[in-house]
């Protein structure tokens, strides 16, 4: 009070005091606005201003800008993608999803009209309180309690139907995605041939769930609020007109406030779609890191690599944590602005919008009769007070409902931007699946112009094809034989291993494939199996049903012991084929696995077979599958490397007796006698296809002995060279073993293994 008394008398006037307060407020806004807007917009301008020609991760700014341009946003591309996905959610006019949507819409409409009825009841209850009419109060309160029963049921039904709609959408998307994912070996090619989809498991699970939930929730958050706004505004206007109130100014105020709020929120809204899409991507990276550690836990434990793996895992988690913090920070300022506009500014505007009609109301409409007008003029003051109180309570309840609806509509824009992120990820998943199914592969997510596409007509060994690989070759299914005409072997990364391969394997021929590591042996099997495409040339081969591939590490499926033998058939398919358990037992006897049946407890025993069976047992189980399916051609990729020589010979002899043509990759000379032809790669893009007769075996054996003789002195010579370098204090001009490439080390290890096994197997060679 002492400070106030010392102010000049001019400042004590109400009008002057208001002007001073307004000036102080404007000055504060002027000083704080740069800080506020700077926080709201983030650090974008700073990053662009101080950016280097390369981004922090080495990415060119042009490419980074192009990626930002393609980031999810609410634009025409978003609506086009959403429409295509909605066609998957609603495949036909009469479907389950459309029926659920109809019931959901009916529940939302019912809730709107119940809200209007409850608002009128609120006004009636307040009127009875003002009039001090206890009997009427009890009657109106009873109505209010009775209407609560259907109202609560409708509220619960809305949530239930929204959950059912989310589940139906998810089921429809998952079904469609699985059909694409498991058609034409897409599940393999999307990870090994195409580089656009980093984490298919993330897209198939979490992204689909978030998209389905977002669509269902957004429908509720848009349909009901829009209906609420239309119905409540119509009710308010009709009520005001019936009492002769002014409806022009409230409508103008409402329009200005809503338009201003929408403009401000739109201007300062962060790009939630881009932020959410990036968060989902980083979640997928973190999940991949965890699954990678689980899949390679034994190797990591042998190396003692837990520290580096923990650092990589923490780095991935910290990346996700930074993204979540960024989203929370941007939401902090956005929600603050949103609450100020929608809670305080709208509340003040609502009071004005309610007060103006009540103050200007005459109590009758211009269309009313003279008797009604006179009755309104003759109404007692206490009745007028109760009528005004009822009108104020009803109008304010309806106006609050309308304001809440408008707020939800405007807040839904943030949800729409988040939906744009989920839509982009799900749409891109389907796009990649469809492209891969149609043979269109991209090794990165970057855009490439059509004229920059790769796979030229003429390729040479050692070159790398840049850009998307175009498939110009032909694959022709034939009844018998395998024939390659000018067939190149090109890896998914574009490396040309063999420029042109020409060979023919007729029925009854048994082909042995040899060569150093990385020369294209397994790559040829991938092409024959249809995993890799034929980029040029012509490949004649039987249908996939007549070819069976057995890798070095056979896959053990989830199921019974019987399921391991008949994989990938089911029990029903086995029965349709006419195979009995007795015949399966004979197959196990052929591969020396009969004891497994007794050890594991019969055909119906269920175990984690990849851990229960040893390496040799798993390889013999893979050969058992070959005898079950009885293909025309068996592609054997070192599939008996862990099997003893005697059992291996027994299995190969039985396969030949069964009429199965063998195409074998092996380093064991003991298997040469089971093959009639040889395909030898030299590792430099060259190859040799010839009949494997006695002279060929002798020449190969002579070459082997010569190499053994040359290699036997290498350790001593290397040791002597090291001693001389140490005495002279000089370094050797030859590369040390530690500097050799990884594939060369593997070649030496394989050669040493061949040398060690040569003596043991020499007596078995013909």
Swiss-Prot record:
Keywords: ATP-binding, Hydrolase, Membrane, Nucleotide-binding, Peroxisome, Translocase, Transmembrane, Transmembrane helix, Transport. GO terms for molecular function: ABC-type fatty-acyl-CoA transporter activity; ATP binding; ATP hydrolysis activity; ATPase-coupled transmembrane transporter activity; fatty acyl-CoA hydrolase activity; long-chain fatty acid transmembrane transporter activity; very long-chain fatty acyl-CoA hydrolase activity. PROSITE patterns: ABC_TM1F, ABC_TRANSPORTER_1, ABC_TRANSPORTER_2. GO terms for cellular component: peroxisomal membrane; peroxisome. Residues 482-708 form the ABC transporter domain. Pfam families: ABC_membrane_2, ABC_tran. It catalyses: a very long-chain fatty acyl-CoA + H2O = a very long-chain fatty acid + CoA + H(+); a very long-chain fatty acid(in) + ATP + H2O = a very long-chain fatty acid(out) + ADP + phosphate + H(+). ATP binds at residues 515-522. Residues 750-766 have a biased composition (Basic and acidic residues). GO terms for biological process: adrenal gland development; cholesterol transport; fatty acid beta-oxidation; long-chain fatty acid import into peroxisome; motor behavior; oligodendrocyte development; peroxisome organization; positive regulation of myelination. Residues 728-766 are annotated as: Disordered. Its main location: membrane. Its EC number is 3.1.2.-, 7.6.2.-. Residues 738-749 have a biased composition (Acidic residues). ATP-dependent transporter of the ATP-binding cassette (ABC) family involved in the transport of very long chain fatty acid (VLCFA)-CoA from the cytosol to the peroxisome lumen. Coupled to the ATP-dependent transporter activity also has a fatty acyl-CoA thioesterase activity (ACOT) and hydrolyzes VLCFA-CoA into VLCFA prior their ATP-dependent transport into peroxisomes, the ACOT activity is essential during this transport process. This is ATP-binding cassette sub-family D member 1. It comes from Danio rerio (Zebrafish).
């Amino acid at each position: 009070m002492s400070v106030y008394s010392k102010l000049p008398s001019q400042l004590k006037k109400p009008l002057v005091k208001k002007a001073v307060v307004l000036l102080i407020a404007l000055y504060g806004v002027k000083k704080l606005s740069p800080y506020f807007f700077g926080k709201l917009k983030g650090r974008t301008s700073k990053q662009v201003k101080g950016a280097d020609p390369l981004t922090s991760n080495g990415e060119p700014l042009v490419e980074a800008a192009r990626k930002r341009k393609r980031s999810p946003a609410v634009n025409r591309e978003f609506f086009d993608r959403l429409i295509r996905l909605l066609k998957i959610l609603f495949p036909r006019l009469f479907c389950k999803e459309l029926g659920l949507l109809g019931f959901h819409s009916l529940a939302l409409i019912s809730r709107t009209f119940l809200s209007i009825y409850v608002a009128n009841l609120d006004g009636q209850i307040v009127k009875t309180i003002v009039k001090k009419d206890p009997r009427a109060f009890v009657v109106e309160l009873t109505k209010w309690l009775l209407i609560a029963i259907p109202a609560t049921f409708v509220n619960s039904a809305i949530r239930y139907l929204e959950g059912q709609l989310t589940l139906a959408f998810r089921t429809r998307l998952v079904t469609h995605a699985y059909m694409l994912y498991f058609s034409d070996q897409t599940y393999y090619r999307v990870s090994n041939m195409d580089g656009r989809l980093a984490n298919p498991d993330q897209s198939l699970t979490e992204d689909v769930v978030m998209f389905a939930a977002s669509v269902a929730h957004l429908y509720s958050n848009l349909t009901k609020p829009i209906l609420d706004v239309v119905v409540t505004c119509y009710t308010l206007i009709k009520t005001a007109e019936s009492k002769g109130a002014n409806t022009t100014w409230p409508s103008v105020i409402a329009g200005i406030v809503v338009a201003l709020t929408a403009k401000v929120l739109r201007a300062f809204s962060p790009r939630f779609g881009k932020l959410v899409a990036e968060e989902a991507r980083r979640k997928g990276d973190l999940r991949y890191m965890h699954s990678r550690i689980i899949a390679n836990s034994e190797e990591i434990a042998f190396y003692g690599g837990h520290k580096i793996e923990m650092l990589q895992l923490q780095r991935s988690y910290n990346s996700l944590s930074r993204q979540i913090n960024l989203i929370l920070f941007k939401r902090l300022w956005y929600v603050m602005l949103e609450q100020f506009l929608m809670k305080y500014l709208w509340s003040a505007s609502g009071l004005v919008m309610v007060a103006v009609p009540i103050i200007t109301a005459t109590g009758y409409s211009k269309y009313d009769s003279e008797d009604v007008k006179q009755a309104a003029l003759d109404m007692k003051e206490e009745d007028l007070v109760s009528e005004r109180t009822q009108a104020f309570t009803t109008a304010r309840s309806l106006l609050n409902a309308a304001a809440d609806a408008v707020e939800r509509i405007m807040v839904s824009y943030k949800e729409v931007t988040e939906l744009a992120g989920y839509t982009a990820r799900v749409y891109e998943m389907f796009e990649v699946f469809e492209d891969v199914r149609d043979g269109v592969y991209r090794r990165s997510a970057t855009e490439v112009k059509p004229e920059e596409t790769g796979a030229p007509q003429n390729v040479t060994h050692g070159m790398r094809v840049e850009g998307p690989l175009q498939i110009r070759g032909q694959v022709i299914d034939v009844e018998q034989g395998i024939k390659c005409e000018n067939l190149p072997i090109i890896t998914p990364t574009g490396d040309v291993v063999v420029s042109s391969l020409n060979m023919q394997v007729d029925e009854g021929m048994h082909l042995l494939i040899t060569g150093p590591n990385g020369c294209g042996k397994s790559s040829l099997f991938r092409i024959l199996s249809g995993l890799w495409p034929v980029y040029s040339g012509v490949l004649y081969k039987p249908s996939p049903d007549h070819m069976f591939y057995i890798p070095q590490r056979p896959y053990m499926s989830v199921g019974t012991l019987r399921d391991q033998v008949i994989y990938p058939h089911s029990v029903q398919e086995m029965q349709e084929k006419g195979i009995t358990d007795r015949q399966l037992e004979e197959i196990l006897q052929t591969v020396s696995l009969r004891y497994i049946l007794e050890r594991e407890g019969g055909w119906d025993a269920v175990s984690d077979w990849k851990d229960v069976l040893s390496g040799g047992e798993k390889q013999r189980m893979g050969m058992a599958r070959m005898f079950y399916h009885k293909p025309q051609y068996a592609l054997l990729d070192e599939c008996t490397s862990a099997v003893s020589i005697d059992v291996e010979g027994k299995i190969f002899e039985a396969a030949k007796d069964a009429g199965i043509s063998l195409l074998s990759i092996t380093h064991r000379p003991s298997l040469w006698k089971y093959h009639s032809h040889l395909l030898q790669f030299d590792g430099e893009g060259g190859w040799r296809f010839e009949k494997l007769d006695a002279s060929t075996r002798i020449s190969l054996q002579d070459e082997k002995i010569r190499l053994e003789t040359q290699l036997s002195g290498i350790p001593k010579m290397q040791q002597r060279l090291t001693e001389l370098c140490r005495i002279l204090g000089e370094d050797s001009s030859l590369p040390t073993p530690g500097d050799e490439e990884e594939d060369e080390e593997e070649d030496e290890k394989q050669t040493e293994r061949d040398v060690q096994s040569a003596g043991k197997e020499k007596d078995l060679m013909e």
